[in-house]
Design a protein with these regions (language model features):
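Bacterial Sec-dependent N-terminal signal peptides
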Residues: 1-25
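Extended soluble regions of mature proteins
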Residues: 19-238
């Protein structure tokens, strides 16, 4: 606990720009198991790395076919997202890599998230947690599969304002994230306080709206197709 407190306080004097490159060093690594909609066979791990006021969330998944026991199969889409959160300035940046290797960049601020912290408490995996809710943003609000509210269970035992899936800004680490609709959720699996990791540098080319990296089918699909075409031309020139 003292280590975590020092980790945060030592960052106060390090207000820096978003153009940060973090080299390999000791840091905190938080592993979340991502529970998918249809079957535990589709579950996979996502990772959150933290050092001196900055976190990097890494979510990657190869395209694959999952066949649950009842002989139904579904395709898991390709996913590769790198998301940085500067929890001293509130700045968020993300790179999304598409299946054809096109790289997209978006930036926004944690102030876009409006949390309601409730009095509801419970214990998850030994952590005392409190419930908070906010509007989910993975799908458009008029989408028939919209998740409604995102529900975060966070612990002030680890007073770091981060969590999985771009949900930041609470006064403690998110231990579990779920939604009002659907079975999608993220569950804390492990915390390594002496991890070694080199932050992946964010590429700021091809800047788009944040929902072009968040929505799987993008907010501006025509723009994305044009970027992909240009990316292909650039590859062919090499």
């Amino acid at each position: 606990m003292k280590f975590i407190y020092f980790f945060i306080c030592s960052s106060v004097g390090l207000l820096y720009s978003q153009d940060i490159v973090v080299t390999e060093s000791n840091m905190i690594k938080v592993t979340y198991e991502h529970h998918t909609h249809y079957s535990p066979l589709g579950n996979y791990d996502t990772y959150l790395y933290l050092t001196d006021g900055l976190s990097q969330y890494v979510k990657t998944q190869k395209e694959k076919i999952v066949k649950p026991a009842w002989n139904y199969e579904y395709k898991m889409n390709f996913v590769k997202n790198i998301n940085n959160f500067n929890f001293l300035t509130g700045a968020i940046e993300e790179n999304r890599t598409l299946k054809d290797s096109t790289l997209l960049y978006a930036k926004w601020n944690v102030s876009d998230l409006i949390w309601t912290i409730t009095d509801e408490e419970k214990t998850i995996n030994g952590y005392n947690v409190r419930k908070a809710t906010t509007d989910s943003f993975e799908l458009e609000i008029d989408d028939p599969f919209y998740y409604n509210k995102a529900i975060a269970w966070f612990t002030t035992d680890i007073p770091i304002p981060v969590g999985p899936a771009r949900y930041y800004g609470l006064p403690g680490l998110i231990v579990e994230l779920e939604y009002e609709r659907g079975s999608l959720r993220y569950v804390l699996k492990d915390i390594d306080f002496q991890a070694h990791y080199k932050f992946i540098e964010i590429n700021k080319e091809n800047e788009v709206d944040k929902y072009d990296v968040i929505y799987y089918d993008h907010k501006n699909p025509k723009l994305i197709k044009n970027i992909q075409k240009q990316n292909k031309k650039n590859k062919n020139k090499k």
